[in-house]
Every structure is written in C-alpha cells, then in structure tokens.
Amino acid sequence: MSLSVEAKAQILAEFGRCENDTGSSEVQVALLTAQINHLQGHFKEHIHDHHSRRGLLRMVSTRRKLLAYLKRTENVRYQELIKKLGLRR
C-alpha cells in the first residue's frame, strides 16, 4: 500500500521549495523515506513477502543515489535534509 494523498501533500509542503515542487531531490528523498518506513511496518507482519522486499531494496538504493547526488552538489541542503529526516546518527 502506498502513501495517502494527504501524507504526500504534507511531505511536499514541508520539504518542497515552492508550492508545486515534486521533483527536487529533497522531496524525492522525503517521499522515499516515508514509503520505506511504511514498508518496514509491513514486513514485521509479513516476514516472507519477498516480492515487496525487492521493491524496498530498490527504494533504498534510489534514496541512497539521490542522497549521494545531493551531498556532492549542495552539501548544506544535504545536511539539513538528513537532520530533518533523522537518517544519519
């Protein structure tokens, strides 16, 4: 199950640069993080759901690549984003 429209709109409002910003790296990483967190709860109940696990690994890989791009191009925005999302410890 994917994120609801309201949840996506809230993430867009929080992380987007402008009102209709859906493609910036920050928004994409925030949406992927929300989907990954949602799927982690799914896997606590459905341990053997390997098809969805493949999708989870794909999302994690995409998020990792976007974060690497953001770190390489604009380190300040990268630091702010990981602090907001609580990704690095």
Swiss-Prot record:
Superkingdom per UniProt: Bacteria
GO molecular function: rRNA binding; structural constituent of ribosome
InterPro entries given in the database record: Ribosomal_uS15 (IPR000589), Ribosomal_uS15_bac-type (IPR005290), uS15_NS1_RNA-bd_sf (IPR009068)
UniProt keyword Nucleotidyltransferase present: no
GO CC annotations, alphabetized: cytosolic small ribosomal subunit
Keywords: Ribonucleoprotein, Ribosomal protein, RNA-binding, rRNA-binding
Keyword Ribosomal protein attributed: yes
GO biological process: translation
Biological role stated in the UniProt entry: One of the primary rRNA binding proteins, it binds directly to 16S rRNA where it helps nucleate assembly of the platform of the 30S subunit by binding and bridging several RNA helices of the 16S rRNA. Forms an intersubunit bridge (bridge B4) with the 23S rRNA of the 50S subunit in the ribosome.
Family: Belongs to the universal ribosomal protein uS15 family.
Quaternary structure, from the entry: Part of the 30S ribosomal subunit. Forms a bridge to the 50S subunit in the 70S ribosome, contacting the 23S rRNA.
HAMAP family noted in UniProt: Ribosomal_uS15_B
Name listed for the protein in its UniProt record: Small ribosomal subunit protein uS15
Originating species: Shewanella pealeana (strain ATCC 700345 / ANG-SQ1)
